[in-house]
């Protein structure tokens, strides 16, 4: 039976204190290469979802709840990746607790989905939640994959590539494991070519620390596009969906943390972060990105 937020175990005061110290450590110290530790900390407790265990920012164009928005994001990425009912081999790099993969498997039943995550606890939880799943859940690194060359028709990274150490190393691995003509599709947070004021710089520093985003991944779309091209991809397409992501998410989060059930289980530091002004997202765009592996 699928686990939901209703099954979440509340943390005691000692666990909560240690968790708070870890959050502060993430934000203030420059080691930004351990996303598994971050997601172990987030676990199923520090999550805004109503029933699911989604962890993305959501696509809020027609959504009113977090679960709806996150599923809409999964649907948008599936469409942008040209998923079809054909028997495609699909890799999801950074699968979280598996919600998006189960959604895709239901809608593209003939595809074979492999869901990979560096966070062992999330893979274990996904297997527990979906014991009869057709999705194959694998623990592993997106920058050092244990898959053969030319194996997948699609490689997807839904709001995960900014964690990878580095994103460009992931591009290289995605190119290797994709078949010629295969598609790499990302939903990613990409820096803008803008001058940052001191408030933006502080917010960016703390945000990169909290979300374990390596400094090497902090670059604009022009650099991003060049890195894709340099690693063998062409046919690059983008869609900027920022207006339907950042501000609507923050508005929802501001209200969501007022719910007594959510308030009781989310770490107080994270509650404060969810209610902070929108400014932390100002130097970034939220892009859907698609690139094709050149035929060899």
Predicted regions and their residues:
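N-terminal auxiliary segments of SAM/dcSAM-dependent transferases
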Residues: 2-46
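Conserved Class I S-adenosyl-L-methionine
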Residues: 12, 237-296
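Conserved alpha-helix/loop element of class I SAM-dependent methyltransferases that forms part
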Residues: 67-86
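Class I SAM-dependent methyltransferase SAM/SAH-binding core
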Residues: 91-144
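A short acidic, Gly/Pro-enriched loop at the edge of an enzyme's catalytic core
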Residues: 143-155
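A short glycine-rich, Lys/Arg-flanked "PGG" loop and its adjoining helix->strand segment in the class I
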Residues: 168-183
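Short, glycine-/aromatic-enriched active-site segment of Class I SAM-dependent methyltransferases
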Residues: 190-214
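Short alpha-helix
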Residues: 215-232
């Amino acid at each position: 039976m699928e686990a939901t937020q209703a099954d979440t175990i509340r943390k005691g005061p000692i666990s909560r204190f240690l968790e708070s110290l870890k959050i502060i450590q993430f934000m203030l110290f420059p080691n930004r290469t351990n996303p598994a530790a971050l997601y172990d900390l987030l676990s199923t407790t520090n999550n805004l979802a109503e029933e699911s265990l989604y962890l993305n920012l959501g696509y809020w164009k027609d959504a009113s709840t977090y679960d709806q928005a996150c599923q809409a994001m999964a649907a948008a990425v599936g469409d942008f990746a040209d998923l079809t009912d054909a028997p495609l081999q699909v890799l999801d790099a950074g699968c979280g607790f598996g919600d998006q993969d189960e959604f895709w498997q239901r809608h593209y039943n003939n595809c074979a989905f492999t869901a990979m995550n560096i966070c062992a606890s999330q893979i274990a939880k996904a297997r527990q939640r979906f014991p009869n799943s057709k999705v194959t859940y694998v623990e592993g690194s997106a920058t050092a994959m244990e898959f053969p060359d030319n194996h997948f028709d699609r490689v997807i990274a839904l709001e995960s590539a900014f964690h990878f150490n580095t994103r460009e190393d992931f591009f290289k691995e995605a190119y290797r494991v994709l078949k010629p003509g295969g598609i790499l599709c990302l939903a990613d947070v990409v820096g803008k070519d803008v001058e940052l004021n001191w408030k933006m710089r502080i917010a960016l520093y703390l945000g990169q620390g909290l979300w374990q985003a390596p400094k090497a991944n902090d670059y604009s779309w022009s650099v991003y596009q060049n890195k894709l091209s340099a690693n063998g991809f062409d046919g690059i397409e983008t869609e900027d969906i920022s207006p339907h992501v950042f501000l609507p998410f923050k508005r929802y989060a501001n209200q969501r943390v007022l719910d007594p059930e959510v308030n009781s289980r989310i770490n107080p530091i994270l509650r404060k972060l969810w209610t902070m002004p929108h400014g932390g997202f100002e130097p970034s765009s939220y892009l859907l990105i698609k690139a094709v592996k050149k035929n060899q």
